[in-house]
Amino acid sequence: MNKVYSLKYCPVTGGLIVVSELASRVIKKTCRRLTHILLAGIPAVYLYYPQISQAGIVRSDIAYQIYRDFAENKGLFVPGATDIPVYDKDGKLVGRLDKAPMADFSSVSSNGVATLVSPQYIVSVKHNGGYQSVSFGNGKNTYSLVDRNNHSSVDFHAPRLNKLVTEVIPSAITSEGTKANAYKDTERYTAFYRVGSGTQYTKDKDGNLVKVAGGYAFKTGGTTGVPLISDATIVSNPGQTYNPVNGPLPDYGAPGDSGSPLFAYDEQQKKWVIVAVLRAYAGINGATNWWNVIPTDYLNQVMQDDFDAPVDFVSGLPPLNWTYDKTSGTGTLSQGSKNWTMHGQKDNDLNAGKNLVFSGQNGAIVLKDSVTQGAGYLEFKDSYTVSAESGKTWTGAGIITDKGTNVTWKVNGVAGDNLHKLGEGTLTINGTGVNPGGLKTGDGTVVLNQQADTAGNVQAFSSVNLASGRPTVVLGDARQVNPDNISWGYRGGKLDLNGNAVTFTRLQAADYGAVITNNAQQKSRLLLDLKAQDTNVSVPIGSISPFGGTGTPGNLYSMILNGQTRFYILKSASYGNTLWGNSLNDPAQWEFVGTDKNKAVQTVKDRILAGRAKQPVIFHGQLTGNMDVTIPQLPGGRKVILDGSVNLPEGTLSEDSGTLIFQGHPVIHASVSGSAPVSLNQKDWENRQFIMKTLSLKDADFHLSRNASLNSDIKSDNSHITLGSDRVFVDKNDGTGNYVILEEGTSVPDTVNDRSQYEGNITLDHNSTLDIGSRFTGGIEAYDSAVSITSPDVLLTAPGAFAGSSLTVHDGGHLTALNGLFSDGHIQAGKNSKITLSGTPVKDTANQYAPAVYLTDGYDLTGDNATLEITRGAHASGDIHASAASTVTIGSDTPAELASAETTASAFAGSLLEGYNAAFNGAITGGRADVSMHNALWTLGGDSAIHTLTVRNSRISSEGDRTFRTLTVNKLDATGSDFVLRTDLKNADKINVTEKATGSDNSLNVSFMKDPAQGQSLNIPLVTAPAGTSAEMFKAGTRMIGFSRVTPTLHVDTSGGNTKWILDGFKAEADKAAAAKADSFMNAGYKNFMTEVNNLNKRMGDLRDTNGDAGAWARIMSGAGSADGGYSDNYTHVQVGFDKKHELDGVDLFTGVTMTYTDSSADSHAFSGKTKSVGGGLYASALFESGAYIDLIGKYIHHDNDYTGNFAGLGTKHYNTHSWYAGAETGYRYHLTEETFIEPQAELVYGAVSGKTFRWKDGDMDLSMKNRDFSPLIGRTGIELGKTFSGKDWSVTARAGTSWQFDLLNNGETVLRDASGEKRIKGEKDSRMLFNVGMNAQIKDNMRFGLEFEKSAFGKYNVDNAVNANFRYMF
């Protein structure tokens, strides 16, 4: 490339053109040439590279940052983005990029003069004759041109590179080439974008130009209009900067943009393609650009010329032998009699190396010599194994493994050379010993499975670099490569740990594309012991100005004094004159470090490394898969920042004794005038997600900062957790590939979507602290720790526990708890804060809540406008103290359905609600709270004083111990509510209203704690209100308490300057409904007795159908019954036994023993519960030859009962009972035929059922209920009809029957007692009709099986259905 140029006047164009001063008579030739390409009289000028001259010209009313971001795919312009808005500097919409998804410009070289169109080829204009190398992506790579491939007649060339490019994906090439008018087809080509570099200008609407930067400082890009001419050349007028036809971001290419690409979106192929390279422009004040369309035929031929003949392996023959002569640069691959000639590097000519393509399944190659293939690469169409004789190596441009192939590579490389790998297929590294070469991979999978040599040494590569976002490297084991020599370049790739334990002491990751993962079933362990730093430190030496100047503190400078070069380290940002006043002697400005250059450089380098060792570590990449990650204590207390992402669904990330920060990532922008790509004060950040099973913190400081969401449980041991932290770090070199330069600061998001989010359960131990300043969903368990809330969006969805731990909702915070909470301390609420205690929303329902319990030591409302809300199925306990004007809401005026409880805790909470929407148990003190109740229950836990009380359809009661309560209210407004007070006939609970009382339809109920004497007058004041209060505000209410309906007798006294409601006495009567429920509960034992009775004689009945001998048997029965009052039960009954046959004169006597187990449950309007019964007995059955029989049985049963009553405050009771049974049955089997019989029966069962007594309190009233032992006597008469069916070796007896079962004695008496007296409920008799049908079958000579179905009807208690199956084995 000519770097010496000048501006010359051209008489043909009438303007200046740029020419090389090394060219011969260029001016005359150029002027003539331009006469053939004038458009609308505008001169065209060649665009020479890299002449520092005019270049991209863009609109001045759009921020220059937009054009910079566009060119580098940064900011809004990420590849694939759609409908991108473009605004001017005033915030007005200029237009939208809505004709195509955003293009990916990564294939454009870093300097903008060439574009990668194949892994080894770029395109540009041939008059760019001086550049010798290109780089891509973040520019941290260099590829040399080995052949320029200049077109003979067109200003175009397609240089070949020395290696396969791994960092980026080549651009797709237009399929239409130079076809006439191809790119004027707006239906197929919907958008045209360009990118280039050079001297930068902006233009206003008046055409005034302002220089922005010198040539090749950076790239800009933008839109161009549909071509005016489209053939071998594309011509358009992007210099008409404000013409809408050029799109919202017009960019006019000028000198310095030579060779830069023009892309078009091919709607037909749904992709962007490169169509041309920029050749000329019409002058700085012109408008027209000329592009040379890609000559696709020429390009294809150029690439084809670099291939040797393809090699086709023949299966079944020996491997291909590869020999190579380094001197001649040629080699031979031979298989049998067939040979293929190949060409490699000759002397220093890399381009002499040709590409080889291999095909043939399961191919094999053996290198007989070391091969130096130069710029030639290997491409495998099929799977191959490539090996080498001892010590033989291969170098070249790289390897391509096509999709679906697996190439096993057993050849080591050369130190200082990298093996470049592309292609979607797999490359398995399987050599031996230490491979000194490196790996750069840009696509597909590389499996590192190097084998150890005889000395045990193994190394697959000296270094590994992943780039482009496409490749995966799989570690065969942890020894394959030094992890610290693994790096991720532009857009990165995946490192698969493959179940291994790997330790990194440094992470070299350029961007978010860097991924460490584990896809193996065996969990990997990743240790990030980040101690080491990049030792590649550059120490530039600046010159000291004798007149003073500015510089960078810490940098090295030199000055020649007295013929000797002296070296200094600058200590300040500026320094003074060194001629007089000599600032070099000022230690605040300079530090002298000697005259030895090497020692001075080393001093600075050591200080830089020492500083880096203390710097925080930031990882921009991703941690994913099946692994645990551990960050141990790092030297110097180094902080670790993750602004990439973590996805470890079954993994644990552990941090020990350090600072760990999860944060979002600032959107990277292109640099303008030296600006950093990111900053602390920028508004646009990318969200990042962190998912893991557990985050484990020990002695750590953890921050979840803006734009980060964490989904994980957290285990904290003596650690500090900040959710919603404003602490962030930005990398001033983010996206550049340069060494990380971190800047710490604060950043507060402006929108809700930019705030951090947490979901999970946190456990705090050993003085841990949790500060919640952002959205929180989950649970908290705190032990000897502290929790502070400032976020307005904290949702506790799991039960909360705070033991020895504080919970504070600070100013503006809002805590919503949905699943219960326990705290042994007070919960604090600050100014404008809110605490909401609610039931648990039922999934997939609109407005259902399961009850929940909140048990705390209290609530302190310390800030003005603090709010405590107890609602939708919540029962809260704990005193409330309002030291500031605050609000307490209990219940809700919005209907909410309380769902049936699915857990014990929820059932308990539901019982405490007593049918109300919400409930509170405790005192409210301080006198400053405004309390409102809607469909709510407040149980006064102590004397209370509040400012205002609004009550709607609610109840306020005073229950608990025998201490009387006083409720003092400044203003009371109550409607449709109950006020329940207590009295011991001397004193009582009281309500005092000091300022105003209003309302109506309220009932005043009074519970007495001992029986009042007959006719006793009490005269006890209950409610005191200001004079003038309506006497109709309270009416005496009737309350069902215990087994009675109690109504106080009141009178209203308006004397003494106030209005009082005074208790005179009581009127009590029995509550028949409660008594009936109690009787039903107490009679559950009778129903259990009947269950056993119905199964008592089943075994003896079977004997009459078996004609068997001694044997063992088993039976299982299942049934369900029902009775009045919503009663229903079901049971499963198991019997096992053994009996023996005694043959006597005219009679067969069977005697046996049985054991039984019954599991039953019952439910009714009054109660629900379960009984487990275990018993045993003896039985005998006499079968007479005449057909008569007698059955006898005695049995004992023990019952273990758990029942919950929903009447009179009974609650759950666990108790044991027992019962005895003595049964006798007789009957006669008449045979109508040999197979058919009829059998009349009579049975009598006498039993004993133990009694039970329960004592408890309903409020302050003592209650008891009792039934004594009783002895049922039950008779049954009936008839059965049966028939036996038999064959050669089988028989089946089928039977059906009906009978009448009846009680001969009344059931036991129930005695109920409460404060109003004793009530006796006499036992009753019951009877029912029984129906049964069944069969008994002989399976083998000594085995029988029986099945029977039963049902009853017409009784107060009936068996709805029952089935029993039995099995007998006879000896």
From Swiss-Prot:
One of its GO terms (biological process) is proteolysis. The record marks 1094-1095 as: Cleavage. GO terms for cellular component: cell outer membrane; cell surface; extracellular region; periplasmic space. Residues 1-55 form the signal peptide. Residues 56-301 form the Peptidase S6 domain. Keywords: Cell outer membrane, Hydrolase, Membrane, Periplasm, Protease, Secreted, Serine protease, Signal, Transmembrane, Transmembrane beta strand, Virulence, Zymogen. The keyword Calcium does not apply. One of its GO terms (molecular function) is serine-type endopeptidase activity. Involved in virulence of uropathogenic E.coli although it is not known how it contributes to it. Has no mucinase activity. PANTHER family: AUTOTRANSPORTER, HEME_HEMOPEXIN-BINDING PROTEIN. This is Serine protease pic autotransporter. The lineage of its organism: Bacteria, Pseudomonadati, Pseudomonadota, Gammaproteobacteria, Enterobacterales.
